[in-house]
A protein has these predicted regions:
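Short linear capping/connector segments at secondary-structure termini
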Residues: 56-64
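Alpha-helix N-cap and loop-to-helix initiation/capping positions
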Residues: 5-8, 31-35, 39, 68-71, ...
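Loop-centered beta-sheet repeat module
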Residues: 1-18
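Long, well-ordered core segments of solenoidal/helical folds
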Residues: 36-55, 91-108
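Residue-level signature of alpha-solenoid helical repeat scaffolds
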Residues: 15, 19-22, 78, 143
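CBM-like carbohydrate-recognition segments
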Residues: 63, 67-149
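Inter-helical turn/loop segments and adjacent helix faces that build the functional surface
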Residues: 20-34, 83-87
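Alpha-helix N-cap/helix-start motif at coil-to-helix transitions, marked by capping-box chemistry
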Residues: 7-11, 41, 135
């Protein structure tokens, strides 16, 4: 892989790991789940530290020159909601405050990057278009909003 911390990949990983606990009865009895839960805790702790002042996460998480990417922000926030850690509450609220303005009156989730292959360098990720509606952006936004209910 490229070694670049791509926002949406981290979002999918975090949300998937968070959801495992919801669907695995008595998950605390499974040592493998403890590995997943521990990895998720470490990931979310790191992600909290790089949330932007607008409450979003960037397409390249650790790159201040890359744009804020809404599908990544929705997925990461959904993972925080599912995890249910009280210390995530302020980060979830910041994300919600940043995501809501990115939803057009038509329902389109804006600032979602197009399909993304593994890029050779950071500039490849920075240049991905955000002009069109993307199913994964709509889906991750719906996941986030439904988890808030």
């Amino acid at each position: 892989m490229s070694g670049i911390y791509w926002g949406r990949a981290n979002a999918w990983a975090a949300y998937t790991m968070a959801c495992v606990g919801k669907f695995l009865p008595e998950n605390y009895l499974y040592p493998q789940y403890m590995d997943i839960s521990g990895a998720l805790d470490e990931q979310l702790t790191a992600l909290k530290g790089i949330q932007t002042k607008h409450g979003l996460w960037r397409t390249i998480l650790d790159d201040s020159e890359s744009y804020e990417e809404v599908s990544a922000s929705c997925g990461i926030s959904a993972a925080m909601v599912v995890k249910g850690n009280i210390f995530h509450k302020k980060y979830i609220q910041r994300a919600l405050d940043g995501i809501i303005p990115q939803i057009a009156s038509s329902g389109k989730v804006m600032n979602v990057s197009a399909g993304t292959a593994v890029m050779r360098d950071r500039d490849g990720y920075r240049k991905i278009t955000r002009d069109w509606i993307q199913g994964w952006g709509q889906g991750l936004a719906l996941a986030f909003f439904s988890e808030l209910l």
